[in-house]
Amino acid sequence: MRIVLLSIICLFFTCRVEKRYENLNLTDYQKQVNNYFKDASVSPLKPRDLKNFKGLDFFEFDSLYVVYAKIQETPESLPFKMKTTTDIPAHVRKYGDLFFQIIDKEFELTVYENLEYDGVEGYENYLFLPFLDQTNGNETYGGGRYIDLYQYDNDSILIDFNRAYNPQCAYDENFSCPIVPRKNFLNTRIEAGVKNFIKN
């Protein structure tokens, strides 16, 4: 087993740092994701699920879930071992707190750096955002979802919940995935991003 914290970055073709946010057409975005899942050499799906795989189920794109968040950095925070779904921890550091609004409601999430990629070319601006919301266990995976973020501005950061994705252990329990901290629960329904996967 191995820790899978950033592998989905490559899934979404953002292995290299983007100079600006690229608002892909949702159809193109879904094709990119689904093509990755269909590729047996990299797919997180089990063979029996891959055999019958037609595509992931997504919420329809909704611009209400594309938000700019104010970021309060925590440079004094120390590295720690984040619990995962296995006994292999993820080595991370709290990068800061994000403050934003969705439909006039105020929310806060903690965002992290993955220290295993510290100094690795292409990941200089990468941040890891795990979150929970009221759709978990129903329309979406019970363990929550992740979003890949890129920080270029000291004051704000773009969060596109339409790009929320499942941990790889949602498809195969042999993967080791960071467990979403309870403090990153959003007391609302985030009807954006990928939905739950129904295994064969």
Predicted regions and their residues:
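Extended, aromatic/histidine-rich regions of cofactor-dependent oxidoreductases associated
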Residues: 165-200
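Short beta-strand segments
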Residues: 105-109, 145, 157, 186-188
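Bacterial Sec-dependent N-terminal signal peptides
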Residues: 1-24
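Start-of-domain marker
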Residues: 18-77
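A mature extracytoplasmic/lumenal domain signature
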Residues: 71, 111-113, 133-135, 161-165, ...
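Terminal leader/tail segments of proteins
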Residues: 63-65, 79-84, 152, 200
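Acidic, glycine-rich flexible loop segments
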Residues: 128-165
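Mid-length scaffold segments of soluble, non-membrane domains
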Residues: 78-142
